[in-house]
Amino acid sequence: MNKKALIVWGGWDGHEPEQVAGIFKTILEEENFDVEVANTLDVYADREKLKILDLVVPHWTMGQIEGTYVSHISEAVQSGVGLAGCHGGMCDSFRTNVDWQFMTGGNWVAHPGNDGVNYTVNIKILRANT
């Protein structure tokens, strides 16, 4: 039986949420996950569905979220559902929601050196032993 993942994308276009969600989807499918992709926060409304997932990958930047949605996803994570994300797609999702920040374990503050710093990102995929 495959593991189940949910990728939720949206918000500010600068972090290319749809494209990044597609990259995450491909990576997870190659690891034998069944992946659902949603571009609405309303998927967080179903508390019980969230709790049967193995992984949630938010990629939503600078948005607003219902308090009940944060409670639902937090409960799922507390019950053992994995949470993974990158950069501003996870920790800059909802700047004004402290509960989201506690759940993710971080908050976006600033780009070191400000914007415009050139850098290279290397993505290295390590395959799980099957």
Predicted regions located by residue number:
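A generic structural signal for well-ordered alpha-helical segments
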Residues: 28, 76-77, 100
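Enriched - but not universal
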Residues: 12-15, 63, 103, 111
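A structural signal for well-ordered alpha-helical segments within the folded catalytic domains
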Residues: 18-22, 67, 71, 117, ...
